[in-house]
Amino acid sequence: MGRSLLHRALTASAFVWAISSSASAQANAPIIGRWDLTVRGADKPYPSWLEVTLSGSRTLVGRFTAGGGSARPISRVEFHKGVVHFAIPPQWDAANGDMVFDGTVAGDVIDGTITTSAGAKEKFTAKRAPLLRRTSAPVWGKPDTLFNGKDLKKWDTFGGTSNWSVVSGVMENAKGGANIITRDTYTDFKLHVEFKFPKDGNSGVFLRGRYEAQIEDDGGKEPILVSLGAIYGLLLPNENPTKGPGAWHTYDITLIGRRVTIVLNGKTIIADQTIAGITGGALDSDEAAPGPIYLQGDHGPVSFRNIIITPAMSGAK
């Protein structure tokens, strides 16, 4: 073989080796997985969530949920020698800049800085999210009526001025203001809740205070990731059996670990699917801990009745 051919052959071999080495490194990159963040915001800490996956042989992509809004796609995650970087455009932010994420991975922890769309820098710590796998079927305890139609003794409010009251056996939120939250916390459970929303209404039922089952007047359109029945931004309902504004709807929700089944108005719209992570508006990112049921009241009027929870015997706190 001539020198020219030999040189080209060696160059090609080196290129293939470099590509293969790069692909192998990314396939085993410790950034891959799901991460629960606590971000030290200007006013107070808030939760966020990150997922990084391998696309093809060497490209890292992902999803990110900020303190509010829904999970956003990340077209490319840069990762080299323990350092991670990506940028995503704004979602609900008033500013127009990209949000920039920079961090350093050390084992099951990431420490770093988020630069917001407005240019503010916020430190964060992320921990690898727990799997929440269950090794046996739950043994259900006794049903507990969370709302008795008379008072709100099992509930507290947070996040603004409370407009919640009991009217003719119904828990009503007259206008946008505070959210309402159970005083008790739960791990695995079955939840029955009846709700009614006005035209253009928007609310939600947060499971363990972290995963929002969306309530919305969506006009009966084909389901999307942020419409009625969705786990907000993460799980898509397979149909939309809405009764429309002004009518009573029912949710029957079973949550075991990360696996959720949602029955809306008698139709199973999400069947034993895995919730990847927290949704926008979550109370915290401590996914392994028990959490409350919280009902969203900050978006506007909404009504609830007949709220009954059946906790797993080992799941109630």
Over which residues does each language-model region extend?
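Bacterial N-terminal signal peptides
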Residues: 9-21
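Boundary at the C-terminal end of the N-terminal hydrophobic targeting segment
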Residues: 23-27
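Bacterial N-terminal signal peptides that target proteins for export
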Residues: 1-11
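Carbohydrate-interacting regions of secretory-pathway proteins
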Residues: 30, 34-317
